Amino acid sequence: MSFAMTDPATTMSWVQVIVLSIVQGLTEFLPVSSSGHLRIVSQLFWGEDAGASFTAVIQLGTELAVLVFFAKDIWRILTAWFAGLADKSKRNFDYRMGWMVIAGTIPVGLAGVLLKDLIRENFRNLWITATVLILFSLVFILAERRGKKTRGFEELTMKDAVVMGLWQCLALIPGVSRSGGTISGGLFLNLDREVATRFSFLLAIPAVLASGLFSLPDAFDPQAGQAASGLQLLVGSGIGFVVGYISIAWLLKFVSNHSFAWFAAYRIPLGLLVMALLGLA
């Protein structure tokens, strides 16, 4: 196990793919930063970064878990959105929700394109990951304390969607957490904890799917991180799907009566541990 930096131009082993896919599935939907965990586990056990492209592609498996878990909600929103486009009299809340997801996706889409090189190179520094794990935990605690948690799902507005979309941009930095960023934003907007969590999942779908498909060619490029075969990416995505589905069900049950501050209690010691290991290395 090593935190030393090595030449990334290597191919991934099956053990790496399986372990990292399980880590991805476990952490993608929890506010602990899946990209941060993948970065830490890769460096700790194999001494090298699996790469942002590999991470983005296996996220497709966990996003498929979201599509399956929320299939009824997604279908209802999509049908209402298309019906509303054709007939103004059918523009109900689900129609507006379709536009809210689109509006909330635009900020992270623009940030991802404009900051692509910065994200894949500078932001993947382990010192940054460890520091952000600690600092953003304080944001969780503040959001829990300041948020009134009184607003329901049908009280969501376009402004809420854009604000949570801006919070989602922070997730481009390993250590923040996509769900942690958007849910914190929702809590600051006084949304109920479960409402913020559910909208966070819906908001992530287009952004993560686009990121994964866009990064697919780079996942086979050793210069973009460790190279993985097509079969490895397929198996990794499958593992991420199964583990991710279980994680979604657990998180929704957990947030109904538990504070997000519990995740801060995990993130802070983890960040300190990584810093200690980096210092020793």
Curated annotation (Swiss-Prot):
Keyword Cell membrane set for record: yes
Top-level EC class as recorded in UniProt: hydrolase
Membrane topology category: Multi-pass membrane protein
Keywords: Antibiotic resistance, Cell membrane, Cell shape, Cell wall biogenesis/degradation, Hydrolase, Membrane, Peptidoglycan synthesis, Plasmid, Transmembrane, Transmembrane helix
Segments crossing the lipid bilayer: 12-32, 50-70, 99-119, 123-143, 156-176, 199-219, 231-251, 260-280
UniProt GO molecular function: undecaprenyl-diphosphatase activity
Alphabetical GO biological process terms: cell wall organization; peptidoglycan biosynthetic process; regulation of cell shape; response to antibiotic
Any matching Pfam family: BacA
Chief site of localization: membrane
GO cellular component terms listed in the entry, alphabetical order: plasma membrane
InterPro entries, per database record: UppP
Enzyme Commission number(s) of this protein: 3.6.1.27
Catalytic activity: di-trans,octa-cis-undecaprenyl diphosphate + H2O = di-trans,octa-cis-undecaprenyl phosphate + phosphate + H(+)
Domain of life where this protein originates: Bacteria
Cellular compartment(s): Cell membrane
Other notes: Bacitracin is thought to be involved in the inhibition of peptidoglycan synthesis by sequestering undecaprenyl diphosphate, thereby reducing the pool of lipid carrier available.
Family, per entry: Belongs to the UppP family.
Role summary: Catalyzes the dephosphorylation of undecaprenyl diphosphate (UPP). Confers resistance to bacitracin.
Protein name: Undecaprenyl-diphosphatase
Organism of derivation: Corynebacterium striatum
Gene this protein is translated from: uppP
